């Protein structure tokens, strides 16, 4: 387990200015927040700090602005947070300088303020010492509650943790604990589901997982690359033929590590890539030249369920097929619901993450039944790849 200080260790917060790095990078439409999931995730940390009499000074980014860009201001996000928190949230139109200092100095014990987008300043992504100093002058201690940005060594995610007494927030703490239970010290057997379209985007992930898990189920477009590498005809299916040798190398590594690989044995195929296209279920040995595999078939789903029955831990990243279109969502939905049911019965610890994965589990209506669903995206993937995350490393005792 990673040793780091949590808010349990931060006992004396009365009247302290607590700089909290949070994830406010939420989807927006016409100046309104359209999904408040990330806002809800930080409420326990804010309430913990304010409940102890601390002044919560929130730091965050929104989008990828190149300098100041009012369309990516955090002002409307602060307003939405106010609604979620059920109390007033102040806002400062800058995150450093006189405006920020003045706004923070006006805070009373137990109050909350959102400072403007840290990425309006180039020093944020450069982890620049002068920018770190300017931020640090606004706080007495630092809390990181944004695991989703922990793979970036930026001023507000890494630099500040080395400048001020640093603690993990509640969301950060639960994310690290869930991932550690799933991969670093898991109950075995561990089964990983890795799907999605391309092997090329998940090479390091696959290479790391074959050393850590007992069973690796490969789905989605990337399964086609493995099937083609094994000599199967994949027709017009999405497939990275140039990675055939790489796919075979991963299979060899898995064999050497004692990791069982599960690939589709049947598929739902169509000649057109569109919702409700005419389709059929066929063996992966019988895909015609004008057909594309768009989902795993029912026999494959049955095999995966059988493997899940014997597993104790599941790590999931990526869908089985083109889940955004019916009927090519069937395998993803069936397996996701099965994992959710086993988890609900206490037979499985299940951790899932990555943008498409979260969307797929929500589509299946089963995200709530998983042990832990990470919204972290890039940081979740890098953790699965076995990489050290700067934002987490900086919190180590």
Swiss-Prot record:
GO terms for molecular function: ADP binding; ATP binding; phosphoglycerate kinase activity. It catalyses: (2R)-3-phosphoglycerate + ATP = (2R)-3-phospho-glyceroyl phosphate + ADP. Keywords: ATP-binding, Cytoplasm, Glycolysis, Kinase, Nucleotide-binding, Transferase. HAMAP family: Phosphoglyc_kinase (MF_00145). Belongs to the phosphoglycerate kinase family. Monomer. PANTHER family: PHOSPHOGLYCERATE KINASE, PHOSPHOGLYCERATE KINASE 1, CHLOROPLASTIC-RELATED. This is Phosphoglycerate kinase. It comes from Xanthobacter flavus.
